[in-house]
Every structure is written in C-alpha cells, then in structure tokens.
Amino acid sequence: MPDKLTPEQRHKCMSRIRGKDTKPELWVRKYLYAHGFRYRLHEKRLPGKPDIVIRRLRTVILVNGCFWHGHTEPPLPSPVEDGKGGVRCKYYVTPHTRVDFWQKKIERNKARDFEDRNALKLLGWNVIVIWECQVNQAEIREQTLQSLVRTLSQIELDIAKIKRPAVKKYDFEEKQPYSMVADENDNPSL
C-alpha cells in the first residue's frame, strides 16, 4: 500500500515525534512530584537511560510509547479488536507501508527493552513500566498513577524494614532488688 504522504511530509511528521518529555512522561512526573517523590531524568549511567530514576528507592520508571515499544496487550477498560479474534492496545498498529522494516524495528526495540530491564534488575534496581495507553486514557490515568504511588510506597516500606536496626531484647529477670529513690517512710511535701 503506497504512503499517502510525500517523503517530505512524512519526514516532517516523523521529525516531530519526541523521545523525551512526552505527554505521558510529563503526566507521570507531575503526579510523582505532587506526591512527594523526587527523581532524576534519563540517567546516562544506567542501562537504557531510564525515563525516571528514584535513587532513594533504587527504582526506575520506564514510560513506554505503545507504538515504539510494541505494546500488544490492551489496558483493561478499552481494548480494541485486532480483526483476528483477539484484542490489542489501540495505540499499536503495524504500519501498512514498509511492513518488514517496521516489524524488525519494533522487534529490535522490544529485545533492547528486555535486555535493559534485565540489566537494571541485575544491578539491584526495581523496574516499573508504564505504557502510554495507561496514562493517555483519562478513565484509567488516575487509577494507574495511584497504583504507581502505592507501589513506590510499598518499595519505600520494604527498604525501611531492611535498614531498620534489629530490636534489642532485654532480660528483665530480677537478680537483685532494685534500689528505691525515696524511702518509704519519707513523706515528701508537695
């Protein structure tokens, strides 16, 4: 199927697609900041340069675009039929032009994502993936972001349990009589 746009129009259209500071990423960042979570962006020292890094919790958040990262699973409220008897994410559709190119590109992206997530986990980082369709759709955005904050709070509690010193146990067996501060016969005047 031929492309409906000229090469110049297609180039202009594709050049406007952002890799950083996308709308879904900004929604997640604003919500996290409003709930007291401080973070760094696109940490170059970590595999895959994660979108959001919360060092204190050793957690990275990847905000993936459904098309570029090949998201095929639908979010719960609004799946789209794929014409083959199944459902898919409504933001992921394989282009009708240059199908081989796009399929290979998306598969490479998915493989790289898998490798980056595994590398981060091996380094001891918690990895959370949020899909574009989970924050683009208003009816599930709030639910997704609340779930994210609950997950981060749970990670924070787990870290606090690990860092908390062991409770020191004392032996309260009476080995000698305790000394009294005041004699029983003393009648203090108040």
Residue map of PLM features:
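Nucleic-acid endo/exonuclease domains
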Residues: 1-79, 83-129, 133-190
